[in-house]
Amino acid sequence: MKTRILTMIALTIIALGLLLGLKIGRKNTDVEVVNQAPSDTLQVKRVYNLIILDESGSMSGLEDVSVSGVNETLQTIRDAYKEFPQQEQLVTFATFSGTPSILNGNSYCRVKRHLQEINDVADFTVREYCPTDSTPLWDTMGLLLCELEEHVTVDDIVLVTIITDGLENTSRKYDSEKIRSLVNRLDEKGWTFTYIGANQDAALAAKDMGIRNSYQYSSDEEGTRNMFKKERSSRMRFYRNSRVETQINRLQEGYFDEDDKE
């Protein structure tokens, strides 16, 4: 009799243990489901960074600070990729002057880095930067924008940065109307443009080209250094916001504004 009672007690304990284990398992499963990140947050997005730097004669004397600023910008993109690995960062970097480049098909545009993943992008060097001649900005923009458009898909993010210390004065193929039409068309596709200018009314020059974001800087060593510093902080904020912003037009405006509020 005692043996039967002990057996029943043991079976009861085992049954309770199994039941308790099932409940714990269900709770753990529930917790895992709740904590699991939504699959869409892990989606990889391509970010195309097009950086266009003036290499005309008026940039002479600012070679070191300009090259340093470009490299700091490239490092910002590297840092962004480390922080946001779901953003695949691609870089095209080019300069321009009125002296045709034999290496670039006698074009005014000098492509230094072309559609490279950021971890493959080598730093810019002073030997690659020799300011001379005039400012064919529109032809350079037209060439680079049309070429980049061939690679961009509807889900990609595009950030175009133009840095110049003077106004357009040499282009032959593109005029202001053609450039404005091109920029407006790409703007409608969600591309973000920024125009950084010295020795001019940068806001007016940007507006004439259909560019929403502009920043004015002083074309001396300190002004150039401060300009690159501001651009880098604005760029990092852009990458951060692009991860969560669903309305692309909100990314396209106010690129520099938040810096002013800090």
For every predicted segment, state its role.
Residues 1-4:
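Positively charged n-region of N-terminal signal peptides that target proteins for export
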Residues 7, 11-262:
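Acidic, low-complexity intrinsically disordered regions
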